[in-house]
Curated annotation (Swiss-Prot):
Transmembrane segments: none
Disulphides: 66-125, 77-94
Keywords, in A-Z order: Disulfide bond, Secreted, Signal
Signal recorded as keyword: yes
The family this protein is said to belong to: Belongs to the venom CUB family.
Signal peptide (from-to): 1-17
Subcellular location: Secreted
Organism: Platymeris rhadamanthus (Red spot assassin bug)
Expressed in which tissues: Expressed by the venom gland (posterior main gland) (at protein level).
Pfam families linked to this entry: CUB
One term under GO cellular component: extracellular region
Protein name in UniProt: Venom CUB domain-containing protein 2
Domain CUB: 22-129
Length: 132
């Protein structure tokens, strides 16, 4: 009976996972793209995987300014993390920051926010394209 209950609980947790995805093509000198987690400024949903795929023209970069990152601090990062992938260079953070800046090394940047079984943590940033 315990095994059946555990199997149902695990299946329910997996079945309830939420995935969101957005993409944007940024132009140097153009408008900023707002990156906000689901429910911001409230906590993001539990079991969330939210992805933002940002691109700009070849030879340019993507600059990110985050004014509100609140994730569980853990080493190594656990279930709550924000990942920056700029074409193979992957950085992961799980902390609180009100002034985090990141500039990609390529013309693409993929951000992924993931949350654990509790609805906790959120992210708010602005992305712009910058010339070399």
């Amino acid at each position: 009976m315990k095994t059946l209950f555990l199997a149902i609980a695990l299946f329910s947790a997996v079945a309830l996972a939420e995935e969101k995805s957005e993409s944007a093509e940024l132009v140097p000198g153009g408008e900023a793209f707002v990156v906000e987690s689901v429910n911001y400024p409230e906590d993001a949903s539990a079991n969330l995987k939210q992805t933002w795929k940002l691109t700009t023209t070849a030879g340019n970069f993507i600059h990110l300014e985050c004014t509100d990152i609140r994730l569980f601090e853990d080493k190594p990062c656990g279930d709550w993390a924000l990942t920056f992938d700029d074409g193979g260079n992957v950085t992961e953070m799980c902390t609180t920051s009100f002034d985090h800046k990141f500039t990609s090394k390529t013309n693409t940047l993929t951000l992924t926010l993931r949350t654990g079984r509790d609805a906790r943590g959120f992210v708010a940033c602005k992305a712009t394209a910058t010339k070399k």
